[in-house]
């Protein structure tokens, strides 16, 4: 992953090619495995309470370790998938960029790049074109439910990708979003309650291994770093009963 992020040749490629390269490198066969594959690649994924205004963020540490931090507010599995792909885009495209130093226009530009990367990454063009050909009424949000289950991506994201590929007319696109708004699908889509939200497991498993095998007693860690249990739980997004 580090090599992908620091490969200067990537700057000469378009986002779709970079997304295809990343998907192949991570061996993503289905988006249902996205979180697992990201953790397997070396990315540390954590959950934290970041309030309602922040969905997720990502960073490279000074030791060149990639982290993705997800908000733990109630959110659908498909929206979490998009957050993960969006943050992967930042890790690969915007390596070590100081976000605080960017102008408003610069920040808007890199956010669009991360959004576009996520769409290309989650919905590979060739396969998506084949699957979309079965859609009969493209302006009807309910027509996208089978694709939502297959790709684990929101109805809105599916239609947007299709529209950008020229598969819907302007009028069809406008009618689609009018229907989406009228039915309240901007906030809650069909199937959102049926698709289980997968939580990060890598860091939890490492900590569980450390404590169960007494590699480092919990008290020793707390005393060494002068922290209390609640801080450690908050830092790694753990439940009260985990430690």
Predicted feature descriptions by range:
Residues 1-243:
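Active-site hotspot residues in diverse enzymes, especially metal/ion-binding acidic/histidine motifs
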